[in-house]
């Protein structure tokens, strides 16, 4: 540990992301990436963007992209905030809306970046314990003193919370911001975007990494009433005015516009998810109902860690969490149909040998 580090640096426990192997032969089902490439229109936009004007700074307000997203969701561009991936948007949101002396509430089994942000900003937080079936008890979020964060669908479980439940949480916290993290909403859930008009305290955060196949370009955004977005811009412009580069912005615009390609790819992921669930059930796995591009699975006979290790030996990566209550579960991203057929073949052979 360096003597030059600040106390925060010494004490923080950083987020640990999923393994990113260099071997292209590995079937990668561990970080919830889209198995399909970006829209051809996105790739063409990237090629066209390689021009002389790359020497100039990009638009700090991302006006063209904000207008595109606003039109898509029937909002004004003043209700859209752009960031360098939804992780940055989340980090800025924690700093914008939550106070150190007030307790923020989020689930004990959820995106593990939340406690990292809270500790980084010295926020007090409470972990709301999820039920045994991994559903959320909305009463745990009632009158949160500092605000609340809901992942919907939840990660790593894939469990979806109804809009009526989201409404109740918003109504129970009218004086505090409720962040709804919708990284996986396009794989079967109904977005809380439709609540923005009636609820000034809701901030919806989405990403183009999952359903739009742009994880490599880092584009996230927040949607909310103008006062919330204005606050986010104040914090963003105190860190870095130019969060999105010119090429990423142009690629994102085309990704949003190509609705036909988006629907085709998400439909294939959902279809493959359902097929995989059925196949796993045939060999005794239990699967938590999922509205995401991944599934959360367990088996009464076999240990999740053993299966995880054996799959890795077979060049198939899934995600294992050595944490209380979920240490016998695996999170499996939904790949292409061909990848999931290989996954099924490998996992059948593994459990037959265990």
Curated annotation (Swiss-Prot):
Keyword ATP-binding among record annotations: no
Biological processes, Gene Ontology terms: L-histidine biosynthetic process
Cofactor(s) the protein needs: pyridoxal 5'-phosphate
PROSITE patterns: AA_TRANSFER_CLASS_2
Enzyme Commission (EC) number: 2.6.1.9
Pathway involvement of the protein, from the record: Amino-acid biosynthesis; L-histidine biosynthesis; L-histidine from 5-phospho-alpha-D-ribose 1-diphosphate: step 7/9
The keyword Amino-acid biosynthesis appears for this protein: yes
Entry's Gene Ontology molecular function annotations: histidinol-phosphate transaminase activity; pyridoxal phosphate binding
Record protein name field: Histidinol-phosphate aminotransferase
Reaction it catalyzes: L-histidinol phosphate + 2-oxoglutarate = 3-(imidazol-4-yl)-2-oxopropyl phosphate + L-glutamate
